[in-house]
């Protein structure tokens, strides 16, 4: 009590002081795993913490460790050869999704109230939907965001973290109710149908928004071909540094220790008339 009186807590600076949290394994944590989930990097340790871990610590969170994720965060399920599968706490025979699957499992099971995630192609949204959590995919430049159980927790973190402050983007209008919100009951994969449970959830959300005064309109046909989007997203990984680095020392003997996606994207950068096809060098 005397120490607290002499050194009072600055709750404005550390609003989450003492709250236990976990960091996604892809988010660098000092003295923690730094393998990117690649089996060939087994035992590699981080010398320092990355931006997410530093931000969590600055806000007062007590970081207990790191969570599971797929190799290089590429897959939408969490099952790397290095760390194995992330079990869904609602049904351990099922996966938590990916790539922030370990974080989703940890929060959904009650291990911690918050765990960091990252999302480019669904890596927060998919695990959240598979485990019943709130998973916000913020505006483009804010790709790092935690997984939590309630929208109140998501709002509290988003308002306090410096990682969410816009730097170059146009500020949103003050009166959000002037914006028109679109929704659809179609999927971008045109041969697939939404489940009745998903449709019910969407329509309940639409009803809520309309009661709150928002203008909501249905889009009858999804404007994007999801299969073309998947192709573009995948091809975009060709030549990416992390994939090239992962296959740099691959041999015929150890290449089975790599995820086929990693191997394919990493070696594709060597294809071409002047390419060096010796990926073992």
Q: Model-flagged regions — what are they?
A:
Residues 48-50, 54-155:
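Short glycine/serine-rich loop segments
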Residues 1-42, 73-74, 172-174, 243:
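Short, well-ordered alpha-helical
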Residues 22, 40-44, 144-149, 272-274:
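Short, well-ordered beta-strand elements within core beta-sheets of diverse protein domains
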Residues 45, 49-52, 202-206:
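Short catalytic helix/loop segments, enriched in acidic residues and glycine
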Residues 24, 66, 117, 184-186, ...:
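Generic beta-strand/beta-sheet core signal
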Residues 27-29, 69-70, 121-123, 189, ...:
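Solvent-exposed loop/turn segments at secondary-structure junctions
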Residues 36-47, 182-185, 190:
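Peri-catalytic substrate-binding/gating loops that frame the active-site cleft of hydrolases
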Residues 1-11, 160-281:
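Amidase signature
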């Amino acid at each position: 009590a005397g120490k607290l009186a002499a050194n009072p807590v600055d709750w404005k600076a550390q609003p989450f002081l003492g709250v236990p949290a976990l960091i996604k394994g892809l988010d660098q944590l000092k003295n923690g795993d730094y393998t990117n989930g690649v089996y060939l990097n087994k035992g590699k340790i981080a010398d320092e913490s990355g931006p997410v871990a530093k931000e969590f610590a600055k806000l007062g969170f007590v970081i207990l460790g790191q969570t599971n994720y797929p190799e290089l965060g590429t897959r939408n399920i969490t099952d790397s050869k290095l760390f194995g599968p992330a079990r869904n706490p609602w049904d351990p025979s099922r996966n938590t999704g990916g790539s922030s699957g370990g974080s989703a499992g940890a929060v959904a099971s009650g291990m911690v109230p918050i765990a960091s995630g990252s999302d480019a192609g669904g890596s927060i949204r998919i695990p959240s939907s598979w485990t019943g959590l709130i998973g916000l995919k913020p505006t483009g430049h804010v790709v790092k965001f935690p997984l939590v159980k309630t929208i109140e927790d998501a709002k509290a973190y988003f308002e306090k973290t410096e990682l969410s402050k816009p730097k170059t983007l146009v500020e949103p209008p003050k009166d959000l109710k002037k914006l028109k919100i679109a929704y659809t009951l179609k999927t971008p994969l045109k041969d697939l149908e939404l489940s009745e449970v998903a449709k019910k959830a969407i329509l309940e959300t639409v009803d809520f928004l309309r009661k709150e005064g928002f203008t909501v309109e249905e889009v009858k046909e999804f404007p994007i071909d999801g299969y073309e989007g998947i192709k573009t997203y995948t091809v975009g990984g060709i030549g990416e540094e992390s994939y090239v680095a992962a296959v740099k020392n691959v041999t015929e003997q150890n290449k089975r220790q790599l995820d086929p996606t990693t191997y394919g994207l990493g070696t594709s950068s060597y294809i071409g008339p002047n390419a060096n096809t010796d990926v073992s060098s």
